[in-house]
Amino acid sequence: MKVLVVNCGSSSVKYTLFEMENEKKIAWGIVECGPSKSYYKRQTAVSEEKKNSVKVTSHTEAVELIINDLLDKEIGSIVNIDEIDVIGHRIVHGGDRFSRSVLVTKEVKKGLKECFSIAPLHTPAHYAGILAVEKMLPGIPSVLVFDTAFHQTMPDYAYMYALPFEYYEKYHIRKYGFHGTSHNYVSQRAAIMLGKSLNELKLITAHLGNGSSITAIEKGKVIDTSMGFTPLQGVVMGTRCGDIDPAIIAYIIKIHPKYRNSEALNALMNKESGLLGISGISGDMRSIVKAATESNKKAKLAFETLCYSIKKYISSYYGILNGIDGLVFTAGIGENSPVVREKICVNLHAIGIEIDTEKNNEPSSKERFVSTAYSRVKIMIIPTNEELMIARESRDCLRT
């Protein structure tokens, strides 16, 4: 069985083709599309990465390029299109309408369009990708896999905001959470590493990248997560502010008239804040760490603020879960920054979290434990694999 995973952004289409018998990647790549500087970068299991300039201005053209490439007699990975059994689409926001992965139907597409207003940066692009795939691959079923779906098990007291109730009823304003596909994947891997069923475990998973979220999981179900109605809430991130006093927004609008424009205000909090905002240097943790070691005070402050915000969520979720069995670090920073992991875990021995400095500093891209022998909580580094999780969800959805 072959599954084609598609992730449509506002100006790009990423794809991965899986052979599900052994869950191996056959081909993968990205088409960056636009009026200028568009390119196609691709790789297969038997060939090196190649990058070419292309003239692609739409999702439809990008999908057409990908399919033609997969079918190419010389460099392709399949002989005919019928080898693809199902297409899995990554969808960032499913609102409270979609609590699980679903096969694409007219009704599902109608429901997805209703989510445009709560995720205007992502959902229209996802929808365009679905239409492009339907045009190029008629007859092959598509499945939508939602980043928000894994978090739909949160109890109402965890997802509710203390606003007038009508804002929830009429406008569906509530906590949704994101990175669900990643949190789902690493929690399953953690159970395997610990040699136990997910139903026996209490876990905290930390997806730390340019965007970051922390999730509390009990018996395989999400109890709480740090991101909210949008991915802006929660811990300090690369360019996102995370949790702030909402009254600050009204104050900023008052002192800076340009922020009366909602797009400018949104850009301030999403693209100009976080590590970048505090340091004035970069939203990239690698640059921040380098500058901090060179005695840049703002970089050091940005680093410490981010790590402190993550530590607060971990400590809070430990209390909510009444103890945990494992703490998982994943995604770009979580997997690759030992200095961040150590800063977060230091002085958490009171709640059973003790990191082994030597293990933590070992360079490796594999799943591994980095806790001390005496740590009550097992600390794990687990590389995420959202594409594989989408492929699994698509396969399982097709079979049910």
Swiss-Prot record:
Mg(2+) binds at N7, E386. It is an enzyme of class 2 (transferase). GO terms for biological process: acetate metabolic process; acetyl-CoA biosynthetic process. The record marks H179, R240 as: Transition state stabilizer. Pfam families: Acetate_kinase. The keyword Cytoplasm applies. ATP binds at K14, H207, L208, G209, N210, G211, D284, M285, R286, G332, I333, G334, E335, N336. Its cofactor is Mg(2+); Mn(2+). Keywords: ATP-binding, Cytoplasm, Kinase, Magnesium, Metal-binding, Nucleotide-binding, Transferase. GO terms for cellular component: cytoplasm. The keyword Transferase applies. GO terms for molecular function: acetate kinase activity; ATP binding; magnesium ion binding. The active site is at D147 (proton donor/acceptor). It comes from the Bacteria. Pathway: Metabolic intermediate biosynthesis; acetyl-CoA biosynthesis; acetyl-CoA from acetate: step 1/2. Its EC number is 2.7.2.1. Mg(2+). Can also accept Mn(2+). CDD domains: ASKHA_NBD_AcK_PK (cd24010). Substrate binds at R90. It catalyses: acetate + ATP = acetyl phosphate + ADP. Belongs to the acetokinase family. Catalyzes the formation of acetyl phosphate from acetate and ATP. Can also catalyze the reverse reaction. HAMAP family: Acetate_kinase. Homodimer. This is Acetate kinase.
